[in-house]
Amino acid sequence: MQRVRQLFLAAVLATTVFGALTLAPRAALAGGRIVVSDAEFGSYASEKEMNAALKKQGKTTFKGAGSWTLNMMIFLGAGSGGNKINVVYYDVSKHPPDQVNFTEVSVKPDQKIVQLNGQAISSDMGFVKGHKYEVRATRVVGGKEKVYAKTTITLK
């Protein structure tokens, strides 16, 4: 009887763990990633719908005549622990990479997904057509930049 009870408890535990993993938010799987698009991201009825939109809309190259509008879905690797993060642009065509600009974004301390539509950047702000930029979601913690997510884009 003791053996049956142990097997039953092991099966319940395994089922619970497996169920929790399969139903875990996919933000954890995409954590540390930024998807950038030239089309705005909307709201999605399901995770499947959101993933399809991310695949369809995600781009790494953006065309413009000195100005570009970027829309981002930011999947933080961990909650920021603060009320603000910075979206920072580094020109990686230069050595060493040079910080060009940043945008401060309000978040909840435990927030894992940040949707940021309509971010206008231009040559007037220091961006150069033909250059590559690393886009980072960061926060300064203890005097050091902590990176929660990043991607690389090219402006054409």
Question: For the regions a protein language model found, what residue spans apply to each?
Answer:
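Solvent-exposed serine/threonine-rich low-complexity stretches and specific carbohydrate-binding patches
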Residues: P97-K112, T152
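Short, solvent-exposed, Trp/other aromatic-anchored flexible loops in extracytoplasmic proteins
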Residues: W68-L70, G77-A78, S106-K132
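Extended low-complexity, serine/threonine- and proline-enriched intrinsically disordered segments
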Residues: A78-Q99, A137
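Short, exposed beta-strand-loop hairpins at the edges of beta-sheets
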Residues: A78-G79, S123-T152
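Short, compositionally biased P/S/T/A/G/V-rich stretches that sit at domain boundaries
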Residues: R26-L70, K156
